[in-house]
UniProtKB/Swiss-Prot annotation:
Keyword presence, Lipoprotein: no
Pfam family, one: ABC_tran_Xtn
Protein name: Uncharacterized ABC transporter ATP-binding protein YkpA
Entry GO MF terms: ATP binding; ATP hydrolysis activity
Species, as recorded: Bacillus subtilis (strain 168)
ABC transporter domain residues: 2-252, 320-537
Record has Amino-acid biosynthesis as a keyword: no
């Protein structure tokens, strides 16, 4: 267990937390959420002792061990992969080092023998004999092949280093586990493995993540950082979001009898619980949900941008025909004879292990890049809005304020008040609209690019990782806006829930062909024939 008592912290004149009092108990996984900049990562550093609060303290039960997912990917460059994982249990690694140093001595004294015996006893108590096999199991689960286990960290790629550091945090069954964005840079298989690991983990987990599917899968509770306080709610992220919306609705219907409000809450909980999986964690979470009262749900103060793409005209039957597109970049063939026909109601999610392949395809069909061979043709009734993964060219060197920046992309001569109102709905309020475009944060740039796409009135959206840099509120708003979109879409995203709730067709691009299926993302992942075909294509 980890208890937070009267913790307050401020940086300069900015207050992050004030008199926070909460407990995180064993057997539960807490999703720590809050707007960008609210202080989620800072709070994890307070819990780990890396940052000292101005008032209050953090208390752990005596003898308990805390593990943290390290963020510095270059910290262990000269160490072997397997050893880096075992370093996750600091005391065990110290014992191993001291023990090995004694046995390496050429003149082994009686004192050395006594000390070695003490260390051997402690080594056995700490499950030292299983350390290497446990580390290897964690690495294998995350997709690090055995031939890399004895390599130095410096020899690994960026995403491989992330996996090793994650294995380090998970190693040795820590009593409290702190994970800051653990799914970043992980492939789908590694995320699924991590989900199962955390679902079966018996101690305390506190996780920060922008991945709603992940939060829904692993969390028993949500810790909401808002107004410098942290409030803990039972349930996963979707339950927190839906219940906060219900609480807002009930607060606006204050004249309704309490009995009616209680009935609405009970119906909501029953409906939500009915969709839960049968896992041990989901079952225990369901029992907690059934005890919820009206006082346990509260409206959120979160602000959600207003995302609404309205096509100016309907699409005809001819949408897009792609035939034999091939492209080589820096000597590597990223697209090889890609062909497909897009229909008017398609919302196609593009997947694949090589992200550059999807980005290249989107650039070609948007007219930003030439193919080496092959053709594509848009239907005469179509108009496209392209959202690139790298948007830097739209902002770098721009001295325009946000109103003038947006005006240059407006197809109609819109008034200042219209553009200010539009930006306001995307959470740029008051004086923020006078910000220079070249000083925006990553999330602000994405909201500007989405505003540009909405103003276009396009009936085809081409979106390359539109959820990057967005907070959970903006991702949720964009997700809902695209579900309602009446046009057609080609898009890619690492956000599982985003893809699952929007796409009705999946195209995976492999080096040896595509797999194109009219089905949802989860069906695509669970379809044995599809997965067999993909395995064959990647193996060729």
């Amino acid at each position: 267990m980890i208890a937070v008592n009267n913790v307050s912290l401020r940086f300069a004149d900015r207050k992050l937390f004030e008199d926070v009092n909460i407990k995180f108990t064993p057997g539960n996984c807490y999703g720590l959420i809050g707007a960008n900049g609210a202080g989620k990562s800072t709070f994890l550093k307070v819990l780990s002792g890396e940052i000292e609060p101005q008032t209050g303290d953090v208390h752990m039960s005596p003898g308990e061990r805390l593990a943290v997912l390290k963020q510095n990917h270059f910290e262990y460059e000269e160490y072997e992969v397997l050893k880096v994982v075992i370093m996750g249990h600091k005391r065990l690694y110290e014992v191993m080092q001291e023990k090995d140093a004694i046995y390496m001595k050429p003149d082994f004294s009686d004192e050395d023998g006594i000390r070695a015996a003490e260390l051997e006893g402690e080594f056995a108590e700490l499950n030292g004999w299983e350390a290497e096999s446990e580390a290897a199991i964690l690495l294998k689960g995350l997709g690090i092949s055995e031939d890399l286990h004895t390599k130095k960290m410096a020899d690994l790629g960026g995403s491989e280093k992330v996996k090793v550091l994650l294995a380090q945090a998970l190693f040795g069954k820590p009593d409290v586990l702190l994970l800051d964005e653990p799914t970043n840079h992980l492939d789908l298989q590694a995320i699924q493995w991590l989900e199962e690991f955390l679902i079966n983990f018996e101690n305390t987990v506190i996780v920060v993540s922008h991945d709603r599917h992940f939060l829904n899968k692993v969390c028993t509770h949500i810790a909401d950082l808002d107004f410098n306080k942290i409030q803990i709610y039972v349930g996963n992220y979707d339950f927190w979001y839906e219940s906060s919306q219900l609480a807002l609705k009930l607060s606006q219907e204050a004249n309704k009898k309490k009995e009616e409000q209680i009935k609405q809450l009970q119906e909501f909980v029953a409906r939500f619980s009915a969709n839960a999986s049968k896992s041990k964690q989901a079952t225990s979470r369901k029992k907690l949900l059934e005890k919820i009262t009206l006082d346990d749900i509260k409206p959120s103060s979160r602000r959600y941008p207003y995302v609404n793409f309205t096509p100016e005209r309907e699409i005809g039957n001819d949408v897009l025909r792609v035939e034999g597109l091939t492209k080589t970049i820096d000597g590597v063939k990223v697209l090889d004879n890609v062909s497909f026909i897009m229909n008017r109601e398609d919302k196609i999610a593009f997947t694949g292990r090589n992200e550059l392949a999807v980005t290249t395809l989107f650039k070609i069909i948007s007219g930003e890049m030439e193919a080496d061979s092959g053709t594509f043709k848009w239907g005469v009734t179509t108009s496209q809005a392209y959202f690139p993964k790298d948007n830097s060219e739209y902002f770098e060197g721009s001295d325009l304020n946000l109103v003038d920046w947006l005006r240059q992309y407006s197809p109609h001569d819109q008034s200042e008040s219209f553009l200010r109102g539009f930006l306001g709905r995307m959470l740029f309020s008051g004086e923020e609209v006078h910000k220079k475009a070249n000083v925006l944060s990553g999330g602000e740039k994405v909201r500007c690019m989405l505003s540009k796409a909405m103003l276009s009135g396009a009936n085809i959206l081409i979106l390359d990782e539109p959820t990057n840099h967005l907070d959970l509120e903006s991702i949720t708003a964009l997700n809902n806006g695209l579900i309602s979109f009446k046009g057609a879409m080609l898009f890619t995203s690492h956000d599982h829930q985003f893809v699952q709730t929007i796409a009705n067709r999946i195209i995976e691009i492999t080096p040896n062909g595509i797999v194109d299926k009219q089905m949802s993302y989860d069906e695509f992942l669970e379809n044995a024939d599809v997965q067999k075909k993909l395995t064959e294509l990647y193996a060729e």
